[in-house]
């Protein structure tokens, strides 16, 4: 296990749909998958993220880890992994997102956040770390996280979901940081935290 660099917007691995994690006829998962999952958790924790998709650290495989609050109560918090997730959502609003309630950030767009329209409810089905079926659903931040991480695995970032002035602001931010090109990354725990944690 180790904290590894997180790829920044513009890296081709972030803009390419991931491949399903192979599952054996007996339901077995690849022998090296636990090590990848542990690395993903450690990297997400070091970055203070609520989720991390495998392609954000350079692996084109369909899985993500999460550590996210949900709306089931003040202390409700969920942590886990979803392998080969399939997403289902309520309708995504067509109106302009609310800057006060719909702000979203991403570890692959360090230090930036923009209002992003998302469905208020989401469910993901897939497999857990042992290859057992798992189903997660939620609303609020948890639903946003499920949509965000599954989007990564489908080859797009939340920036691709932005509309209007928010999309224009994001393009300016990417350009001003010199992002949008292959090969850029940042290492959580090294230098200033781009999110101010």
UniProtKB/Swiss-Prot annotation:
Q: What does the entry list as the binding residues for Fe cation?
A: 106, 148, 152
Could you tell me the superkingdom of the organism this chain comes from?
Answer: Bacteria
Q: What is its cofactor?
A: Fe(2+)
TM segments? none
Query: Which terms are listed as keywords in the entry?
Result: Hydrolase, Iron, Metal-binding, Protein biosynthesis
Q: Can the keyword Isomerase be found in this entry's annotation? A: no
Q: Tell me what reaction this enzyme catalyses.
A: N-terminal N-formyl-L-methionyl-[peptide] + H2O = N-terminal L-methionyl-[peptide] + formate
* GO-annotated molecular function: metal ion binding; peptide deformylase activity
A single GO BP term for this record reads: co-translational protein modification
The cross-references to CDD domains, in alphabetical order and at most eight, read:
Pep_deformylase
Cofactor binding, note field: Binds 1 Fe(2+) ion.
Q: Which residues form the active site?
A: 149
Q: Iron: is it a keyword of this entry?
A: yes
E.C. numbers:
3.5.1.88
The family database entries (Pfam families) matched by this protein are listed as: Pep_deformylase
The record, for InterPro entries, names:
Peptide_deformylase (IPR023635), Peptide_deformylase_sf (IPR036821)
Family of the protein in this entry: Belongs to the polypeptide deformylase family.
What role is this protein assigned? Removes the formyl group from the N-terminal Met of newly synthesized proteins. Requires at least a dipeptide for an efficient rate of reaction. N-terminal L-methionine is a prerequisite for activity but the enzyme has broad specificity at other positions.
* Name recorded for this polypeptide: Peptide deformylase
- Which species is this UniProt entry from? Mycobacterium marinum (strain ATCC BAA-535 / M)
Source gene?
A: def
């Amino acid at each position: 296990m180790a904290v590894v660099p997180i790829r920044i917007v513009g890296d081709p691995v972030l803009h390419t749909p991931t491949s399903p994690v192979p599952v054996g006829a007996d339901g077995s998962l690849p022998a090296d998958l636990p090590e990848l999952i542990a690395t993903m958790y450690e990297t997400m924790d070091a970055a203070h993220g609520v989720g991390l998709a495998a392609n954000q650290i350079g692996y084109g495989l369909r899985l993500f880890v999460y550590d996210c609050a949900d709306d089931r109560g003040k202390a409700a918090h969920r942590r886990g992994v979803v392998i080969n997730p399939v997403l289902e959502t309520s309708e995504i609003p067509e109106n302009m997102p609310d800057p006060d309630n719909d702000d979203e950030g991403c570890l692959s767009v360090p230090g930036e956040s923009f209002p992003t329209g998302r469905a208020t409810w989401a469910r993901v089905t897939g497999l857990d770390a042992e290859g057992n079926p798992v189903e997660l659903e939620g609303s609020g931040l948890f639903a946003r996280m499920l949509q965000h991480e599954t989007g990564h695995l489908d080859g797009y970032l939340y920036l691709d979901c932005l509309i209007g002035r928010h999309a224009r602001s994001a393009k300016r931010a990417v350009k001003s940081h010199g992002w949008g090109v292959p090969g850029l990354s940042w290492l959580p725990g090294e230098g200033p935290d781009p999110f101010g944690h």
